[in-house]
């Protein structure tokens, strides 16, 4: 559910904060009301993965149009999106381009087979001389602040990690209170209690870091440092917490009847 909210948000916020007035009037109303449109962004590439400064997808100006060519992968909800925000290299800088569904040259590939997050469909995407109006360049002549877009996605994904970790912690904590071994709940065992304490500490620390980064984003401050630190810490935290949750549940942690396995 969180990813289904995040995907359109990574289109809405760049247009809201950096788009031209014409782009805001044309596209933002579609994200509310009865005529809601799905949207997603396309950054990751097969060759360079998540490297926004080495994009092989190109955009060249041709008269009153931009022509985009390249390949993207791991694009969430691409088959259902009415609007895509595609990032491409233009004269050495990374810029965003708004592409509407059905634009000639925009091709959506087969659904990828994910190991996890199976509720979120991801696809490959091809741009074959995809021609869009010149005014669909995000921000118009001014362009977009790519660092700010990346920082916002980092903060959002890290907040999701906090949510995943908290759910795993609460489930394993409640299980430890109920599971009795050798005449007492395993939560009373020091080894389990230490695990739960460390999990709680790391979750709260990450949440506070996420709040600080989000607060600075709302104030339109540079959050490159905070977002980078947060992403690194959140990644390690969520792996540790979910792993400990599986350990606390023992054999039950490997069974899908319990959500920590997922």
Regions found by a protein language model. Give the residues of each.
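Flexible, small-/acidic-enriched active-site or ligand-binding loops
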Residues: 54, 102-134
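Alpha-helical interface subdomain recognition
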Residues: 3, 18-23, 33-34, 52, ...
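Short glycine/proline-enriched turns and hinge-like loops at secondary-structure junctions
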Residues: 51-53, 77-81, 118-120
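A short core secondary-structure module
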Residues: 69-108
